[in-house]
Amino acid sequence: MSVPTVLERIIARKFQEVAERSARVSLAELERLAKTADAPRGFANALIEQAKRKQPAVIAEIKKASPSKGVIREHFVPAEIAVSYEKGGATCLSVLTDVDYFQGADEYLQQARAAVSLPVIRKDFMVDPYQIVEARALGADCVLLIVSALDDVKMAELAATAKDVGLDVLVEVHDGDELERALKTLDTPLVGVNNRNLHTFEVSLETTLDLLPRIPRDRLAITESGILNRADVELMAINEVYSFLVGEAFMRAEQPGLELQRLFFPEQVKKTVQPLD
């Protein structure tokens, strides 16, 4: 019997989590909370408008830990990090809410979003419509759908639920087959290419460059993972990729927002980003 991959273990846990959460808070109650949540801030539109100007459209990630790296940031105050990112020029935020594998929390999303005016994506492993409604109830503006974790029917169902509650969708792919499935099944303009293989956690920027010619021009290609220095950013710009999701490079820096500036807006680096206490 083969050993389950990290992704397979995470997905199995998510089904358990949905059962546990829905026993505590009903879907009907979540739907009520979703209707009273703050209006969505336009996650997709913010990225598209920035990328149209050929300026870096950065989704800056708030992430305490990961399965492959363990704890990434010891001093972890989501609201402070969010403010630092906003000052540093982020277009959107990504907040990990997975508890078991990334040491995330729903409260982190709420704290980060309350501290800034930026749109926020709930970064988690979506397997059930319950989680989508829950994301809107928490105040999220967008959800992530990972193609390798979903079949086409479930992917379409989750996207339809997102649309119903007013959430944008970022669909994430890692290879050509997943890209083909995503383009066929969903009409979201946001196509994220994860340079990290979620089964092995190996990273290669070639993943984005290989898939880029197959992403239609009316979709926005977002490169995710493995952007560590200016050379990586410039490589993407040469290939007309202006949208990025970056987490670890920022989380390891003393001042995440200043690191964002250094990486994406070096000409603007000044003493404007306050140190985190």
Curated annotation (Swiss-Prot):
Superkingdom of the source species: Bacteria
GO molecular function, one term: phosphoribosylanthranilate isomerase activity
Keywords: Amino-acid biosynthesis, Aromatic amino acid biosynthesis, Decarboxylase, Lyase, Tryptophan biosynthesis
Root EC class: lyase
Pathway terms, separated by semicolons: Amino-acid biosynthesis; L-tryptophan biosynthesis; L-tryptophan from chorismate: step 4/5
UniProt xrefs under Pfam families: IGPS
Keyword Amino-acid biosynthesis attached: yes
InterPro entries: Aldolase_TIM, Indole-3-glycerol_P_synth, Indole-3-glycerol_P_synth_dom, Indole-3-GlycerolPSynthase_CS, RibuloseP-bd_barrel
Catalysed reaction, written as an equation: 1-(2-carboxyphenylamino)-1-deoxy-D-ribulose 5-phosphate + H(+) = (1S,2R)-1-C-(indol-3-yl)glycerol 3-phosphate + CO2 + H2O
GO biological process, one term: L-tryptophan biosynthetic process
EC number(s) given by UniProt: 4.1.1.48
Keyword Amino-acid biosynthesis: yes
CDD domains associated with the record: IGPS
Family affiliation: Belongs to the TrpC family.
Protein name: Indole-3-glycerol phosphate synthase
